[in-house]
C-alpha cells in the first residue's frame, strides 16, 4: 500500500465518523479499512490532510454545503477505484450506504442524479455546447433569490373602495 491509499482511507474514516447516524457499525467498517490500508495515525501522521484542511477553512465561512458536495464526490470516486477488492468491498458498501443515507436523505433518485452529473464527459464538444446553453438557467437557480412581493392595499379602509371590512366597524355605516 502506498502512502496515498493510506491517507485517503484515513480521510474517509474521519469524514464518515463526523456524520454517521448509525456510528457503531460504520466505525467498525472504517476500522476494517484502516487495517487493510495500514492507515494508523502514526503511519499517515506526517502527511498533509487530503480534504480536512479544506473542510476546516470552509467551516469558518459557514458555507459548507458546496465543499461537502466535492468531498462526497471525491469519496465516491475513491470507492469506484477500489471496486472489486473483495477484502474491503463489504466495508466500502456499508460506508457508501451510510453516506447516501446522510447526504442524499436516503433518496436513490438524488444519488443517481448526483452520480450522472459526476460522470458527464466534459471534453465532449456537444456536452460543452449544451452546458454553456444551460448556464444562464443554472446561474439563475444558484443565485440568491430576491423576493419581490407587491403589497396589496385594501381600498375599503382608506376610502378607495366600497367593500365592507368585517374588522373595521366604521365600514358598515
UniProtKB/Swiss-Prot annotation:
The modification Pyrrolidone carboxylic acid is found at residue 23. One of its GO terms (biological process) is defense response to virus. The keyword Secreted applies. Glycans are attached at residues 38, 105. GO terms for molecular function: cytokine activity; type II interferon receptor binding. InterPro entries: 4_helix_cytokine-like_core (IPR009079), Interferon_gamma (IPR002069). Pfam families: IFN-gamma. GO terms for cellular component: extracellular space. Its main location: secreted. Keywords: Antiviral defense, Cytokine, Glycoprotein, Growth regulation, Pyrrolidone carboxylic acid, Secreted, Signal. The keyword Coiled coil does not apply. Released primarily from activated T lymphocytes. Homodimer. Interacts with IFNGR1 (via extracellular domain); this interaction promotes IFNGR1 dimerization. Type II interferon produced by immune cells such as T-cells and NK cells that plays crucial roles in antimicrobial, antiviral, and antitumor responses by activating effector immune cells and enhancing antigen presentation. Primarily signals through the JAK-STAT pathway after interaction with its receptor IFNGR1 to affect gene regulation. Upon IFNG binding, IFNGR1 intracellular domain opens out to allow association of downstream signaling components JAK2, JAK1 and STAT1, leading to STAT1 activation, nuclear translocation and transcription of IFNG-regulated genes. Belongs to the type II (or gamma) interferon family. This is Interferon gamma.
